[in-house]
Structures are given as structure tokens and as C-alpha cells.
């Protein structure tokens, strides 16, 4: 990859796709546009969902999202103020070039969120207003029905999370 400024680094589409395929199955993967840069949607062979660079969310959105979904720590290779590599979930890391005169490169953790299509997607859409082009079309066609369905799915997700937390309490 070309060096990218660390200050405004967002994972590229190709890496987001690899991350999605490592989680939801490789082969036959398709993607849909979303309403925000740094947010990707993939449908993979086994499942699918949103892959979201934490840098694409505001601090307030991250706080709300993290009440329900935990970020996945990926590793980026940083040299000076530039990202020069990303640890790939399939190939791991290889072929990264760096310039010794810029100082030693170091691995840093970079948070990425995965919102599975069957459940967690409602968290992202409810908290942020981010949509796929398909969902945006549904919302534009009938905003009231779309919002009502989204709210219902979000509440179901929160209720299920609470039940799991209660079930995990030792008796």
C-alpha cells in the first residue's frame, strides 16, 4: 500500500473486503455503497454486514456504538506520521517497504467495527444514520415505515443483549 497520513487514516475498501471475508466467508462477495466514507457493506458467502473504520464515526457515535458492539483491533504499521501497512487477515503481513531514515516502523492497534447483517446492523443505522444505498432507497420511499422498522429491530437487539447479560450472571 502507499503510505497514508496517520492523522486521517481510514482502511481501504480492499482491506475491508478481506476483513469481511475472513469473518463471513470467502467467495461470491459483493458490496453496496454506503452513505459515509470509511464505512463498507459486504455480502459474503456465509453472511455479511458493515465493516466500519472507527475513524469514520464521531466520538459521540463511538460512545453509543460501544455500549453494544466492541471494536475489533486490527494492526497497522506506522512509520513517523504515516501508515505504511496493514496486517491482512488472510496473508498476514508481507512485502511492506519502509525507509530506514524515517525511523523504525511500529505496529499500532487501529479499531474497526463489524456489524453483522442479521442483528448488529441496526445499532449502526440507529446510532449514526449510516445507510447502504438499498436501505437509503427504502427510507426515501417510506420514511415512517423505515424508521419504525429500524427502531423495532434496534429495541429487539438491545433486549436480547440484556437477556444474555442476565443469563451470564452466576446463580
Predicted regions, residues:
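Intrinsically disordered, low-complexity regions enriched in Pro/Ser/Thr
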Residues: 2-14, 19, 23, 139, ...
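Short N-terminal "domain-start" leader segments
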Residues: 3-55
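Short amphipathic alpha-helical segments that mediate assembly, nucleic-acid/protein binding
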Residues: 3-6, 61-62, 143
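Eukaryotic, polar/proline-rich low-complexity intrinsically disordered regions
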Residues: 25, 36, 85, 100-102, ...
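A short, structured beta-strand/loop element
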Residues: 44-105
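Extracellular structured ligand-interaction cores
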Residues: 47, 112, 121
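A short, exposed loop/beta-hairpin motif centered on an aromatic-Gly-Thr core
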Residues: 107-116
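Short, compact, well-ordered microdomains
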Residues: 116-170
Amino acid at each position: 500500500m502507499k503510505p497514508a497520513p496517520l492523522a486521517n487514516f481510514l482502511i481501504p475498501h480492499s482491506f475491508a473486503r478481506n476483513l469481511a471475508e475472513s469473518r463471513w466467508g470467502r467467495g461470491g462477495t459483493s458490496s453496496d455503497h454506503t452513505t459515509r466514507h470509511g464505512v463498507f457493506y459486504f455480502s459474503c458467502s456465509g453472511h455479511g454486514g458493515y465493516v466500519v473504520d472507527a475513524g469514520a464515526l464521531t466520538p459521540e457515535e463511538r460512545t453509543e456504538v460501544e455500549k453494544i458492539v466492541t471494536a475489533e483491533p486490527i494492526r497497522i504499521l506506522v512509520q513517523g506520521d504515516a501508515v505504511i501497512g496493514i496486517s491482512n487477515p488472510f496473508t498476514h503481513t508481507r512485502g511492506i517497504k519502509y525507509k530506514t531514515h524515517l525511523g523504525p516502523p511500529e505496529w499500532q492497534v487501529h479499531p474497526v467495527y463489524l456489524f453483522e447483517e442479521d442483528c448488529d446492523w441496526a445499532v449502526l443505522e440507529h446510532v449514526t444514520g449510516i445507510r447502504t444505498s438499498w436501505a437509503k432507497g427504502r427510507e426515501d420511499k417510506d420514511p415512517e415505515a423505515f424508521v419504525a422498522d429500524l427502531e423495532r429491530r434496534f429495541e429487539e437487539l438491545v433486549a436480547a443483549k440484556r437477556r444474555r447479560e442476565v443469563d451470564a450472571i452466576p446463580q
